[in-house]
């Protein structure tokens, strides 16, 4: 079975990339159980708590990330350098229980996946 990685690199609500990535992630979960989810660059904003998308008249799809463990998707990683570059503390509460890793460690984890989809 192919190992599939989803890499979120774009901020939420500025484009549909994050929402489309989440939809693809949920659909893929029906086909394989070996899924890894990575948050890099502006993608780290996808899983920050306390967002209020309704204030900009956007749909709140961020809360859907919370249900991923119900679909047996429970491998999440966040780039430590991306958090630091954006002034976000590594210990800030996230929507998901994600492990914070260095860029080198993320690259190593990502190298074990057969398919990489970027959103």
From Swiss-Prot:
Cell cycle listed as a keyword: no
Predominant cellular place of this UniProt entry's protein: cytoplasm
GO biological process: tRNA processing
Keywords: Cytoplasm, tRNA processing
Alphabetized InterPro entries for the sequence: DsrEFH-like (IPR027396), Sulphur_relay_DsrE/F-like (IPR003787), Sulphur_relay_TusC (IPR037450), Sulphur_relay_TusC/DsrF (IPR017462)
Keyword Transferase in annotation: no
Pfam families in UniProt: DsrE (PF02635)
Cellular location(s): Cytoplasm
Any GO CC annotation of this UniProt entry: cytoplasm
Top-rank taxon, per record: Bacteria
Subunit structure: Heterohexamer, formed by a dimer of trimers. The hexameric TusBCD complex contains 2 copies each of TusB, TusC and TusD. The TusBCD complex interacts with TusE.
Function: Part of a sulfur-relay system required for 2-thiolation of 5-methylaminomethyl-2-thiouridine (mnm(5)s(2)U) at tRNA wobble positions.
Family designation: Belongs to the DsrF/TusC family.
Name of this protein: Protein TusC
Gene source species: Enterobacter sp. (strain 638)
């Amino acid at each position: 079975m192919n190992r599939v990685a989803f890499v979120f690199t774009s901020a939420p609500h500025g484009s549909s990339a994050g929402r489309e990535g989440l939809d693809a992630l949920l659909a893929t979960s029906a086909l394989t159980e070996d899924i890894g989810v990575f948050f890099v660059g502006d993608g780290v904003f996808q899983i920050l708590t306390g967002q209020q998308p309704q204030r900009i008249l956007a749909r709140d799809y961020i809360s859907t990330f919370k249900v991923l463990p119900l679909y047996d998707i429970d491998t999440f990683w966040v780039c430590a350098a991306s958090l630091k570059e954006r002034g976000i503390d590594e210990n800030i509460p996230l929507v998901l229980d994600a492990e914070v890793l260095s860029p080198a460690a993320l690259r190593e984890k990502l190298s074990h996946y057969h398919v990489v989809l970027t959103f």
